[in-house]
């Protein structure tokens, strides 16, 4: 099984089921393409340049907001951009530092506005799809057990601050399915990820509403005496 047990808040069972369907499709592609190989750098741009002016207020997604099991982060903040990795819709974020990499800190970005650039930790590796590669394909790869194992085993640095480099990630050798197979995967995966995004956005709205109303209920600021159960 990919990743870890989904958190009750941000990754409900429905989303976990949808994600596992995508992973099953990806697994089948890897099994059926055992006779052909390619490197990640052939299908993905690693840390592509994204334009974002210094001090421009933009959406910031912190490492603490990345899920260890799902594609959607737990939230974000609007901050002036002073540095960090930049990304846009269709990108996959992969934590490159211990213990975040081992814990599965990963995200798929599909909830920004059109042409919006967001930013986050310098400890992210950003994977962006090359031509004809469905963006969901790279997210599934980032959670593929063989890929994660490779990334963890190729970390370097002092104890407690080990990292894997983008160049090393780009050298990962994987099965290379046919263009038709990848295209078919994309058609199904895009629908699954769309459902996951909509579920997560709705869950985020409900959580925000709960956090707003609950303190007022506890403080007696909302009259519930006329509510019938």
Feature annotation, model-predicted:
Residues 152:
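Conserved functional hotspots at enzyme active or ligand-binding sites that engage polyanionic ligands
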């Amino acid at each position: 099984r990919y990743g870890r047990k989904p958190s009750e808040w941000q990754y409900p069972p429905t989303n976990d089921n949808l994600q596992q369907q995508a992973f099953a499709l990806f697994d089948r592609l890897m099994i059926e393409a055992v006779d052909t190989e390619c490197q990640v750098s052939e299908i993905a741009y690693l840390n592509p340049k994204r334009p974002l002016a210094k001090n421009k207020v933009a959406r910031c997604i912190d490492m603490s907001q990345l899920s260890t099991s799902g594609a959607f982060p737990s939230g974000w903040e609007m901050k002036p951009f002073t540095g960090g990795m930049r990304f846009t819709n269709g990108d996959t974020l992969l934590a490159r530092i211990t213990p975040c990499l081992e814990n599965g800190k990963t995200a798929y970005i599909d909830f920004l506005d059109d042409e919006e650039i967001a930013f986050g930790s310098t400890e992210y590796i950003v994977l962006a799809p090359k031509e004809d590669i469905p963006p969901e394909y790279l997210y599934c790869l980032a959670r593929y057990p063989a890929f994660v194992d490779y990334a963890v085993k190729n970390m370097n640095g002092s104890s407690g601050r080990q990292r894997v480099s983008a160049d090393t990630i780009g050298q990962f050798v994987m099965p290379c399915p046919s263009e038709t197979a990848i295209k078919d995967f994309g058609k199904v995966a895009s629908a699954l990820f769309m459902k996951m995004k909509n579920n997560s956005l709705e869950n985020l709205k409900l959580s925000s509403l709960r956090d707003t109303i609950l303190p007022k209920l506890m403080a007696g600021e909302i009259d519930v005496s006329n509510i019938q159960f």
